[in-house]
Amino acid sequence: MTYFPEEVVEHIFSFLPAQRDRNTVSLVCKVWYEIERLSRRGVFVGNCYAVRAGRVAARFPNVRALTVKGKPHFADFNLVPPDWGGYAGPWIEAAARGCHGLEELRMKRMVVSDESLELLARSFPRFRALVLISCEGFSTDGLAAVASHCKLLRELDLQENEVEDRGPRWLSCFPDSCTSLVSLNFACIKGEVNAGSLERLVSRSPNLRSLRLNRSVSVDTLAKILLRTPNLEDLGTGNLTDDFQTESYFKLTSALEKCKMLRSLSGFWDASPVCLSFIYPLCAQLTGLNLSYAPTLDASDLTKMISRCVKLQRLWVLDCISDKGLQVVASSCKDLQELRVFPSDFYVAGYSAVTEEGLVAVSLGCPKLNSLLYFCHQMTNAALVTVAKNCPNFTRFRLCILEPGKPDVVTSQPLDEGFGAIVRECKGLQRLSISGLLTDKVFMYIGKYAKQLEMLSIAFAGDSDKGMMHVMNGCKNLRKLEIRDSPFGDAALLGNFARYETMRSLWMSSCNVTLKGCQVLASKMPMLNVEVINERDGSNEMEENHGDLPKVEKLYVYRTTAGARDDAPNFVKIL
């Protein structure tokens, strides 16, 4: 065998950015393992309990970018108890001890303390990017520490976090020498910000390309900021209220006209329909538009704006857009690739804001559509069959019918054939969420056709264990399976042990799994953590009642090299 110099091998490895590929080459021999671990610059950890933080830091001491995910995805729907875990502290502490060159940290669904942010800010002299998504546990004091000490910060991105507001001081903690910001997003912070500090910060950030403001930022402040950021590409507006002064909006219009590079808009907090006309001149150049925080706008307001966005590729909107509004999307946005329609708070029984008609219209008019999240109150098989034929390039298809177990609204039949068409026609489908009245037949279709599927979400579906077994046996690339309120039990859980060797995780809540079944799984698969979650009182009542084979309230199963975690609360039992 011919051996290349280590420098040559490392150079070859640099052409393998995908973590999966690098993991593979590290298994070839000890020499390659050493070269790969010392040259790895980016590490992704999909489950913070799958491996110990110290082990990651020891293996990859030269890592520059670290991504860690915490709580299961169903935490977004309040199905994971608040104190379940997902703590960022051990990861930041391990990195501070062993990865001194860390420059970027991204965390999702994790509990991040102010103390951890303080440690982060003081430990990495070349730290450049902090991205926190759906995290909690920290306050603006932690952000103040990051602003004060991370003097090379390029990106501070706070998305959908629960942040305790302790005043507007944090924004003034960026030193005068901080001129490196490229992206700043604090839209999720609920408190006031210091307008003067914000204006000064953006004024000395010539490379700023993305800025997303919270609802406390006034129109007048927004106009002043935009005059200082003519190269902005992504803007999250502040508060566009009905109580406005015309002079401020004219200033805003003048400032927006100078933003020739702007391609994405979001925000529109408490937006007044009157203010939208000031945005119209920008619409023709937009490729991204997020109107999901604008409940004050009705279908007419939305369509007047969207009809002008002829280059739009990504649209997030509330269901108040209506089917007619989606027809406007279909006729105007021919390049649309991603559509998300979220439920609004206002709903009248018997009235559906968006239905199968709007979805079919978009599929007909937007042939490039490949990613969908669609909340609605009704659907038909015929519509789903049409959508599948019109848009066979879906990689993500998430349909959420808000009334559990609702059948085809026309035929009253299960929606098996509709979802069957989706998995049959969309060969590259990687993520799927299904809902409505569904039998085991739909899972037979999924197991047979969804060969590229990596994540499947199931709610209120299926007849028997056979449904889940179709998926476990057929979907060879499945990484994450999450199920709620479905009749799958021990036979499905224990039907294919080998599948757990390649899956990242399984979540089951309000199903028919018993404690005995969980114990069998844990004994057969020692590389798994089998977590039984009993929120009711944290007692061991399930263990004490073996005779009736009590059902498990919630089950979380995941592969791990770390063994049982040591921070589990008393309502979590790790078998």
From Swiss-Prot:
<dbReference type="GO" id="GO:0010011">
    <property type="term" value="F:auxin binding"/>
</dbReference>
<dbReference type="InterPro" id="IPR032675">
    <property type="entry name" value="LRR_dom_sf"/>
</dbReference>
<dbReference type="Pfam" id="PF18511">
    <property type="entry name" value="F-box_5"/>
</dbReference>
<keyword id="KW-0833">Ubl conjugation pathway</keyword>
<feature type="binding site">
    <location>
        <begin position="396"/>
        <end position="398"/>
    </location>
    <ligand>
        <name>1D-myo-inositol hexakisphosphate</name>
    </ligand>
</feature>
<dbReference type="InterPro" id="IPR001810">
    <property type="entry name" value="F-box_dom"/>
</dbReference>
<feature type="domain" description="F-box">
    <location>
        <begin position="1"/>
        <end position="45"/>
    </location>
</feature>
<dbReference type="GO" id="GO:0005634">
    <property type="term" value="C:nucleus"/>
</dbReference>
<dbReference type="InterPro" id="IPR001611">
    <property type="entry name" value="Leu-rich_rpt"/>
</dbReference>
<comment type="subunit">
    <text>Part of a SCF (SKP1-cullin-F-box) protein ligase complex. May interact with auxin and auxin-responsive proteins.</text>
</comment>
<dbReference type="GO" id="GO:0031146">
    <property type="term" value="P:SCF-dependent proteasomal ubiquitin-dependent protein catabolic process"/>
</dbReference>
<dbReference type="InterPro" id="IPR041567">
    <property type="entry name" value="COI1_F-box"/>
</dbReference>
<feature type="site" description="Interaction with auxin-responsive proteins">
    <location>
        <position position="375"/>
    </location>
</feature>
<dbReference type="InterPro" id="IPR006553">
    <property type="entry name" value="Leu-rich_rpt_Cys-con_subtyp"/>
</dbReference>
<feature type="site" description="Interaction with auxin-responsive proteins">
    <location>
        <position position="160"/>
    </location>
</feature>
<feature type="binding site">
    <location>
        <position position="340"/>
    </location>
    <ligand>
        <name>1D-myo-inositol hexakisphosphate</name>
    </ligand>
</feature>
<feature type="region of interest" description="Interaction with auxin-responsive proteins">
    <location>
        <begin position="343"/>
        <end position="348"/>
    </location>
</feature>
<feature type="binding site">
    <location>
        <begin position="479"/>
        <end position="480"/>
    </location>
    <ligand>
        <name>1D-myo-inositol hexakisphosphate</name>
    </ligand>
</feature>
<feature type="binding site">
    <location>
        <begin position="108"/>
        <end position="109"/>
    </location>
    <ligand>
        <name>1D-myo-inositol hexakisphosphate</name>
    </ligand>
</feature>
<comment type="pathway">
    <text>Protein modification; protein ubiquitination.</text>
</comment>
<dbReference type="GO" id="GO:0000822">
    <property type="term" value="F:inositol hexakisphosphate binding"/>
</dbReference>
<feature type="binding site">
    <location>
        <position position="69"/>
    </location>
    <ligand>
        <name>1D-myo-inositol hexakisphosphate</name>
    </ligand>
</feature>
<feature type="binding site">
    <location>
        <position position="431"/>
    </location>
    <ligand>
        <name>1D-myo-inositol hexakisphosphate</name>
    </ligand>
</feature>
<dbReference type="InterPro" id="IPR036047">
    <property type="entry name" value="F-box-like_dom_sf"/>
</dbReference>
<keyword id="KW-0927">Auxin signaling pathway</keyword>
<dbReference type="InterPro" id="IPR041101">
    <property type="entry name" value="Transp_inhibit"/>
</dbReference>
<dbReference type="GO" id="GO:0009734">
    <property type="term" value="P:auxin-activated signaling pathway"/>
</dbReference>
<dbReference type="Pfam" id="PF13516">
    <property type="entry name" value="LRR_6"/>
</dbReference>
<feature type="region of interest" description="Interaction with auxin-responsive proteins">
    <location>
        <begin position="76"/>
        <end position="77"/>
    </location>
</feature>
<dbReference type="GO" id="GO:0016567">
    <property type="term" value="P:protein ubiquitination"/>
</dbReference>
<feature type="region of interest" description="Interaction with auxin-responsive proteins">
    <location>
        <begin position="459"/>
        <end position="460"/>
    </location>
</feature>
<protein>
    <recommendedName>
        <fullName>Transport inhibitor response 1-like protein Os04g0395600</fullName>
    </recommendedName>
</protein>
<feature type="site" description="Interaction with auxin-responsive proteins">
    <location>
        <position position="484"/>
    </location>
</feature>
<feature type="site" description="Interaction with auxin-responsive proteins">
    <location>
        <position position="134"/>
    </location>
</feature>
<dbReference type="GO" id="GO:0019005">
    <property type="term" value="C:SCF ubiquitin ligase complex"/>
</dbReference>
<feature type="binding site">
    <location>
        <position position="504"/>
    </location>
    <ligand>
        <name>1D-myo-inositol hexakisphosphate</name>
    </ligand>
</feature>
<keyword id="KW-0539">Nucleus</keyword>
<feature type="region of interest" description="Interaction with auxin-responsive proteins">
    <location>
        <begin position="400"/>
        <end position="404"/>
    </location>
</feature>
<dbReference type="Pfam" id="PF18791">
    <property type="entry name" value="Transp_inhibit"/>
</dbReference>
